[in-house]
Amino acid sequence: MGEIRVDNFSLEDFFSGDIDSYNYSSDPPFTLSDAAPCPSANLDINRYAVVVIYVLVTLLSLVGNSLVMLVILYNRSTCSVTDVYLLNLAIADLFFALTLPVWAASKVNGWIFGSFLCKVFSFLQEITFYSSVLLLACISMDRYLAIVHATSTLIQKRHLVKFVCITMWFLSLVLSLPIFILRTTVKANPSTVVCYENIGNNTSKWRVVLRILPQTYGFLLPLLIMLFCYGFTLRTLFKAHMGQKHRAMRVIFAVVLVFLLCWLPYNIVLFTDTLMRTKLIKETCERQNEINKALEATEILGFLHSCLNPIIYAFIGQKFRHGLLKIMANYGLVSKEFLAKEGRPSFVGSSSANTSTTL
């Protein structure tokens, strides 16, 4: 991941329209020497619509992920392994979403926050994106070990899980360093500044690197891990006789399905764009504009994932609902009778009490 579109300046007069395709896909602009004039469609209406969507996603993520963090921290004495992952995931998604208003403002006014904040916000969004996806893969492995192998040794040692989370954050930081190093500001015209990678004369080479990095570690590898782990987990649940089996399967299906719906379309379009920009398929103005529009639309789906995770991992699950109702009952927002009527959550999984598969 890496770039945010800024479409509010004269594209024909600078970079021959390539800045218009400036998006969150780590797609550095062409240099003047390799750019070809290509008029870009007017996206004013789309730009303002995207700004509204960014703000809504931020608000939904703020509410949803804050509630997840509140419930987990309030019940930290009974915190499970899955809860540790969920807490880190909520933090990552929350900070990812909090960067969106900045990029929304840049769509209207260009980048107005200076070179240092260009690096900081880009770096923060990059780290939180990587950590979010890597933590999703860790959760799938946790469920796989807990259900398929009924593993309790690693699960019971919470400090090891915390070490795994710290490792994921560190790995995310390392993967994000190219963005921090290369991202800077540039004047697109006398009145507009943009925030993007400055890669000099090695544009084509670095473009491939900055595309392969997020697509491999930010999508393909986590997806393969999730498909493998959840595939075997589902097979085990089908064979088992568990009272909450169908509920657990719904959550697992939702995890994979929503991840695919959010990120698969974007990555398909991004891969096509990479093939075009590396001259493996013919580049035309019509094709470039079509891909730019597709990147804009599918990018929004990817951003939506940051506010959908609380729904998938928490709101569907019994454990979260009971934890939230417990907090509300303690503050008199719901009656104790209602809390008792709802009952305590039950979980599916191994004999270990330190993991749940229904969240």
UniProtKB/Swiss-Prot annotation:
Tell me how the protein is altered or processed after translation.
Answer: Phosphorylated upon ligand binding; which is required for desensitization.
Q: Which UniProt keywords apply?
A: Cell membrane, Chemotaxis, Disulfide bond, G-protein coupled receptor, Glycoprotein, Membrane, Phosphoprotein, Receptor, Transducer, Transmembrane, Transmembrane helix
Glycosylation sites (chain numbering): 8, 23, 201-202
Q: What is its main location?
A: membrane
Topology, Cytoplasmic side = 75-83, 142-162, 231-250, 315-359
Q: List the disulfide bonds.
A: 118-195
Which stretches are Extracellular in the membrane topology? 1-47, 105-119, 183-207, 273-296
Q: Which domain of life is it from?
A: Eukaryota
Name the GO terms of the biological process aspect: acute inflammatory response to antigenic stimulus; calcium-mediated signaling; cell surface receptor signaling pathway; cellular defense response; chemotaxis; immune response; interleukin-8-mediated signaling pathway; metanephric tubule morphogenesis
What is the membrane topology noted in the UniProt record heading this document?
Multi-pass membrane protein
Q: Which CDD domains match?
A: 7tmA_CXCR1_2 (cd15178)
GO MF, one annotated term: interleukin-8 receptor activity
Q: Where in the cell is it found?
A: Cell membrane
Its GO CC terms are:
cell surface; external side of plasma membrane; mast cell granule; membrane
User: Where does the sequence pass through the membrane?
Assistant: 48-74, 84-104, 120-141, 163-182, 208-230, 251-272, 297-314
Which Gene3D superfamilies does the entry mention?
A: Rhodopsin 7-helix transmembrane proteins
* Keyword check for Transmembrane helix: yes
Subunit composition and interactions: Interacts with IL8. Interacts with GNAI2.
Q: Which family does it belong to?
A: Belongs to the G-protein coupled receptor 1 family.
- What's this protein's function? Receptor for interleukin-8 which is a powerful neutrophil chemotactic factor. Binding of IL-8 to the receptor causes activation of neutrophils. This response is mediated via a G-protein that activates a phosphatidylinositol-calcium second messenger system. Binds to IL-8 with high affinity. Also binds with high affinity to CXCL3, GRO/MGSA and NAP-2.
What name appears for this protein in its UniProt entry? C-X-C chemokine receptor type 2
